[in-house]
Amino acid sequence: MAAEDREMMEARGAGESCPTFPKMVPGDSKSEGKPRAYLEAESQKPDSSYDYLEEMEACEDGGCQGPLKSLSPKSCRATKGQAGDGPKPAELPPTPGTERNPEMELEKVRMEFELTRLKYLHEKNQRQRQHEVVMEQLQRERQHEVVMEQLQQEAAPRLFSGGLQNFLLPQNQFAMFLYCFIFIHIIYVTKEMVFFLFAKHYLFCIAAILLCLIKTFWS
């Protein structure tokens, strides 16, 4: 059985990766009514007998057991692609990861810009608040100084007049005793001075008294 299979494969032609395509006869009535795409699809179908024989040969060489499995069309397509008989595979679309990378970079840049802008605004607000606090303190100090100056100007005459009156009024018994002692001492000193002047300079005192009397009566 294996020898017959090998002979059949040699008859088909050694070195072919996929079954040969049937040639189209120009006078074939069946092929005239079918479109070209349909004929090409039929010509690209793998030969089941060839797949079966190839699988048989592989099992004999490898000593596999169990039922034989027919080759998948994917393997046949791969062999066709390697041999250059089949159509070229279409280019794979770009993965979503490669498309998202620029978007993620743009999002990161935008977030960094927003963070820097918010940080700048926060610092600006802090500086403005500090400036406002300092200006309020200076304004309060100036207002306090102005009020104190006004109070001092208003209280200066009152303190002089009221202070003198309060000083002359005795506040307690000791102040009253002090005032009496000073008054008596002033009277005693004045009397002694008058007696001394009349005793030593009586002529001068008499002349002064006469001048005062003449001036008083003359006026």
Curated annotation (Swiss-Prot):
The chain crosses the membrane at residues 167-187, 194-214. Residues 1-10, 29-45 have a biased composition (Basic and acidic residues). It comes from the Eukaryota. InterPro entries: TMEM247. The keyword Transmembrane helix applies. Residues 1-101 are annotated as: Disordered. It is found in: Membrane. Residues 121-156 form a coiled coil. Keywords: Coiled coil, Membrane, Transmembrane, Transmembrane helix. Pfam families: TMEM247 (PF15444). One of its GO terms (cellular component) is endoplasmic reticulum. It is a multi-pass membrane protein. Its main location: membrane. PANTHER family: TRANSMEMBRANE PROTEIN 247 (PTHR36691:SF1). This is Transmembrane protein 247. It comes from Homo sapiens.
